[in-house]
């Protein structure tokens, strides 16, 4: 529930975002294909674009039912960090049709992962400017990742 609070802080005031509890209120394991299918049932007619990092796109062939996942998503938005190499031609050989679904999203991205932020907190290193102000304050108030 701590992460739920952090997400709510992160999206507060932005009507374009909403928190879904679909992966919170059901038993594990959670697979992306199941999450997308559940959301499509809850929101019939809606388009679903799955956002992921370039590193996750590289690992997609190892996911649960990756071909079904590709078919089910209307698009896959890939946020690419400078160091991420995206080889769609190689992925297309393993997952036919993926190149038609992937959209590389050019947006400012912080060159740090959530795991690295949690480690900085645990190591008592600065992390303030990696998070929205409300999330930063909540992490401090809740004493998370120490």
Residue ranges and their predicted role:
Residues 1-146:
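Nucleotidyltransferase catalytic core that binds NTPs
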């Amino acid at each position: 529930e701590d992460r739920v609070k952090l997400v709510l802080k992160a999206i507060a005031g932005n009507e374009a975002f909403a928190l879904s509890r679909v992966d919170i209120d059901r038993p594990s394991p959670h697979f992306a294909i199941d999450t997308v299918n559940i959301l499509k049932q809850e929101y019939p007619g809606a388009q679903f674009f799955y956002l992921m990092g370039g590193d996750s796109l590289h690992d997609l062939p190892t996911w649960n039912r990756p071909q079904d996942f590709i078919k089910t998503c209307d698009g896959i938005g890939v946020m690419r960090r400078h160091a991420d190499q995206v080889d769609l031609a190689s992925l297309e050989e393993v997952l036919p049709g993926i190149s038609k679904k992937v959209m590389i999203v050019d947006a400012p991205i912080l060159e740090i992962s959530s795991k690295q932020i949690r480690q900085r907190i645990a190591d008592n290193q600065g992390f303030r400017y990696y998070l929205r102000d409300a999330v930063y304050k909540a992490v401090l108030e809740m004493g998370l990742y120490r």
